[in-house]
UniProtKB/Swiss-Prot annotation:
<dbReference type="GO" id="GO:0005635">
    <property type="term" value="C:nuclear envelope"/>
</dbReference>
<feature type="binding site">
    <location>
        <position position="243"/>
    </location>
    <ligand>
        <name>dTTP</name>
    </ligand>
</feature>
<keyword id="KW-1015">Disulfide bond</keyword>
<dbReference type="GO" id="GO:0009185">
    <property type="term" value="P:ribonucleoside diphosphate metabolic process"/>
</dbReference>
<keyword id="KW-0963">Cytoplasm</keyword>
<feature type="binding site">
    <location>
        <position position="57"/>
    </location>
    <ligand>
        <name>ATP</name>
    </ligand>
</feature>
<feature type="binding site">
    <location>
        <position position="431"/>
    </location>
    <ligand>
        <name>GDP</name>
    </ligand>
</feature>
<keyword id="KW-0597">Phosphoprotein</keyword>
<dbReference type="GO" id="GO:0006264">
    <property type="term" value="P:mitochondrial DNA replication"/>
</dbReference>
<dbReference type="InterPro" id="IPR005144">
    <property type="entry name" value="ATP-cone_dom"/>
</dbReference>
<feature type="domain" description="ATP-cone">
    <location>
        <begin position="1"/>
        <end position="92"/>
    </location>
</feature>
<feature type="modified residue" description="N6-acetyllysine">
    <location>
        <position position="17"/>
    </location>
</feature>
<feature type="site" description="Important for electron transfer">
    <location>
        <position position="738"/>
    </location>
</feature>
<feature type="active site" description="Cysteine radical intermediate">
    <location>
        <position position="429"/>
    </location>
</feature>
<dbReference type="GO" id="GO:0043025">
    <property type="term" value="C:neuronal cell body"/>
</dbReference>
<comment type="function">
    <text>Provides the precursors necessary for DNA synthesis. Catalyzes the biosynthesis of deoxyribonucleotides from the corresponding ribonucleotides.</text>
</comment>
<feature type="binding site">
    <location>
        <position position="256"/>
    </location>
    <ligand>
        <name>dTTP</name>
    </ligand>
</feature>
Length: 792
């Protein structure tokens, strides 16, 4: 049997040679657990004559990855094999790789199709000695296998389908793409990125330094006008943004309702649903080519709109196709008045914005006055019990996980952009809260701090370093505003005027584990607060320093910050004594700030996988999860838990199988000590009341909002109602992003004789179920505290 080498030569397959190659990459690993010969045995089983060394390495890496549950060092080894393979297949020198990317010729048409911008290449070539020598390739070996494979699959630039960049090249490309000729700043950013202190968002990693540097993650629009022109102009904006890979939030509350009169044609409107089906099809069609990533639109509606009940059905799996728009995402923009009326079981009036104009243009008391004046004037189209609509909302969430819940009055009352006008929606992921109008499409550029990195070996938290890195991020994101490619002019206008940015986090759960704090412990709750205080403090300080240099952002005057009111003041919260806010406030009073908004904890799905961290602000959902590779799927165990169990001599095959049998929970495994059980509770075992309380406590230092998922294993209408009202009363802006539920682990299979299941019985059951759900919902509204206790 022979193998084909990288240079095309053939060589006999040699067991020892494969073992030796793997052995060389085992430096620093625990050889009591890691067995290179075992990997070689499995690799040999998968061989065929004429296999290439690249395929051999890929197989060895996958084999090592499947052994991760034996010991976490196998995951490190798997990544090392894969990275070593990439290093053998790519050029080493950064400037050479950039030249190759620039000189790319498209094989289909023979044209020069540069993959990096000529300006980027010029800067790299002019500073190649400094940039080339700044790169430390060993840092590629610090990624875990799945982080590296994510980079390889989606982030590293390819030439004719073959990866041309190494991870370090990508990070330097991003750094130069942002900082241009400022080489000191580029190298500083490169070092922080490659040491994993923070990461820029995916669009920035994809596109920085390229010909079309579309580096923004989020776009927010409100309908240009309630007319055919307005609807289709807005649709075109959505299509152009989607083509450039932006996620979108659209406010549609101003669109007239079903049956509303249309003066131009003397006809009646078809309402929201047919319009949203057109948006749905555009989202499907504009997918960045080849279904790379389908367009993603979140549609925001206020609950007084006459079409609200139909809106709540749009994502359901059952029902007529022409009444559904399942590729869109749906969100409610909820005024406090609605929540008050649900709580007190009052009537709720549904209106058409064409007949009752301006409701989406006001908030708070002004909204309540206008809404109640329309009620008094008899302009309403339909009156329902507020709880009837609430029931429909909860029903939709239980079935589909959405609509998202955002509180319009909190979003406006606690916004530093409130001087611009009423904010009408959030974005696709519910953490961006920015002003939009017919002339302005709001934009946000994002980055996230890896919170696990700031835990010191002595189990203290390095707040100084956290503030320092936050300041670098502010400077980076502020630069991105100026160098960014904007798909539409309204986005350019808005971003240049208000200069908002969004700094988020990942690895909060990892930081708690490294500090040895259970997620719900008082220590974790204090650290949660202090982390976000620090980030907000550092961000304000950096933005103020930028304002000293370049002046405040254009619409600064009249904003709460310009009056000395910071986010925590709007929450009526005093910060801890970690930072001295008085001199910072004085500095801001003197110079202003460069960015209207700063903090926005977003979901961090892909970038957290790259850095090997738990997502965003979330607790761990499980201590074991499945990963797929070409050769099959296998279980990965929470690496912190694996390390702890290994150190205590508790890790073996039987333990692994017990954790799998318990669906990733360790609470009922007798051999595991209590301190570890406390530390490794999954989100299903943590009180959601605590999760919401911690969200509110950090919320006082978050000037945008946060992507906050609610996890209820088996939601009932009472639990869900309690969660929503608790979050609303805590002052959250985003009450819920997704409702995450847990499928039954082993659903019992029932075989029904369908002939015997009479329609009458079915209808009776549905009626009983509805009565039970309504009773649970009402009980929850009437006995808030008790219900919260039973509704973890």
């Amino acid at each position: 049997m022979h193998v084909i080498k990288r240079d095309g030569r053939q060589e006999r397959v040699m067991f020892d040679k494969i073992t030796s190659r793997i052995q060389k990459l085992c430096y620093g690993l625990n050889m009591d657990f890691v067995d290179p010969a075992q990997i070689t045995m499995k690799v040999i089983q998968g061989l065929y004559s004429g296999v290439t060394t690249v395929e051999l390495d890929t197989l060895a890496a996958e084999t090592a990855a499947t052994l991760t549950t034996k010991h976490p060092d196998y995951a490190i080894l798997a990544a090392r094999i894969a990275v070593s393979n990439l290093h053998k297949e790519t050029k080493k020198v950064f400037s050479d790789v950039m030249e190759d990317l620039y000189n790319y010729i498209n094989p289909h048409n023979g044209r020069h199709s540069p993959m990096v911008a000529s300006s980027t290449l010029d800067i790299v070539m002019a500073n190649k000695d400094r940039l080339n020598s700044a790169i430390i390739y060993d840092r590629d070996f610090s990624y875990n296998y799945f982080g590296f494979k994510t980079l390889e699959r989606s982030y590293l630039l390819k030439i004719n389908g073959k990866v041309a960049e190494r991870p370090q090249h990508m990070l330097m490309r991003v750094s130069v793409g942002i900082h241009k000729e400022d080489i000191d700043a580029a190298i500083e950013t490169y070092n922080l990125l490659s040491e994993k202190w923070f990461t820029h968002a995916s669009p920035t990693l994809f596109n920085a330094g390229t010909n079309r540097p579309q580096l923004s993650s989020c776009f927010l629009l409100s309908m240009k006008d309630d007319s055919i022109e307005g609807i289709y102009d807005t649709l075109k904006q959505c299509a152009l943004i989607s083509k450039s890979a932006g996620g979108i939030g659209v406010a549609v509350s101003c669109i007239r309702a079903t049956g509303s009169y249309i003066a131009g044609t003397n006809g009646n409107s078809n309402g929201l649903v047919p319009m949203l089906r057109v948006y749905n099809n555009t989202a499907r069609y504009v997918d960045q080519g080849g279904n790379k990533r389908p367009g993603a639109f979140a549609i925001y509606l206020e609950p007084w709109h006459l079409d609200i009940f139909e809106f709540l059905d749009l994502k359901k799996n059952t029902g007529k196709e022409e009444q559904r728009a399942r590729d869109l995402f749906f969100a409610l923009w909820i005024p406090d008045l609605f929540m008050k009326r649900v709580e007190t079981n009052q009537d709720w009036s549904l209106m058409c914005p064409n007949e009752c104009p301006g409701l989406d243009e006001v908030w708070g008391e002004e909204f309540e006055k206008l809404y109640e004046s329309y009620e008094k004037q008899g302009r309403v189209r339909k009156v329902v019990k507020a709880q009837q609509l609430w029931y429909a909302i909860i029903e939709s969430q239980t079935e589909t996980g959405t609509p998202y819940m955002l509180y319009k009055d909190s979003c406006n009352r606690k916004s530093n952009q409130q001087n611009l006008g009423t904010i009408k929606c959030s974005n696709l992921c519910t953490e961006i809260v920015e002003y939009t109008s017919k002339d302005e499409v709001a934009v946000c550029n994002l980055a996230s701090l890896a919170l696990n990195m700031y835990v010191t070996p002595e189990h203290t938290y390095d707040f100084e370093k956290l503030a320092e890195v936050t300041k670098v991020i502010v400077r980076n994101l502020n630069k991105i505003i100026d160098i960014n490619y904007y798909p539409i002019p309204e986005a350019h206008l808005s971003n240049k005027r208000h200069r908002p940015i969004g700094i988020g986090v990942q690895g909060l759960a990892d930081a708690f584990i490294l500090m040895r704090y259970p997620f719900e412990s008082p220590e974790a709750q204090l650290l949660n607060k202090q982390i976000f205080e620090t980030i907000y403090y550092g961000a304000l300080e950096a933005s103020c320093e930028l304002a000293k240099e370049y002046g405040p952002y254009e619409t600064y005057e009249g904003s709460p910050v310009s009056k000395g009111i910071l986010q925590y003041d709007m929450w009526n919260v005093a910060p801890t004594d970690l930072w001295d806010w008085k001199p910072l406030k004085e500095k801001i009073a003197k110079y202003g700030i460069r960015n209207s908004l700063l903090i926005a904890p977003m979901p961090t799905a892909s970038t957290a996988q790259i850095l090997g961290n738990n997502e965003s602000i979330e607790p761990y959902t499980s201590n074991i999860y499945t990963r797929r590779v070409l050769s099959g799927e296998f279980q990965i165990v929470n690496p912190h838990l694996l390390k702890d169990l290994t150190e205590r001599g508790l890790w073996n095959e039987e333990m692994k199988n017990q954790i799998i049998a318990c669906n990733g929970s360790i609470q009922s495994i007798p051999e595991i000590p209590d301190d570890l059980k406390q530390l490794y509770k999954t989100v299903w075992e943590i009180s959601q009341k605590t999760v919401l309380k911690m969200a509110a406590e950090r919320g006082a230092f978050i000037d945008q909002s946060q992507s906050l998922n609610i996890h209820i294993a088996e939601p009932n209408y009472g639990k869900l109602t309690s969660m929503h009202f608790y979050g609303w009363k805590q002052g959250l802006k985003t009450g819920m992003y997704y409702l995450r539920t847990r499928p039954a682990a082993n659903p019992i299979q029932f075989t029904l004789n369908k002939e015997k299941l009479k329609d009458k019985e079915k209808a009776l059951k549905e009626e009983e179920e509805k009565e039970r759900n309504t009773a649970a919902m009402v009980c929850s509204l009437e006995n808030r505290e008790e219900c919260l206790m039973c509704g973890s």
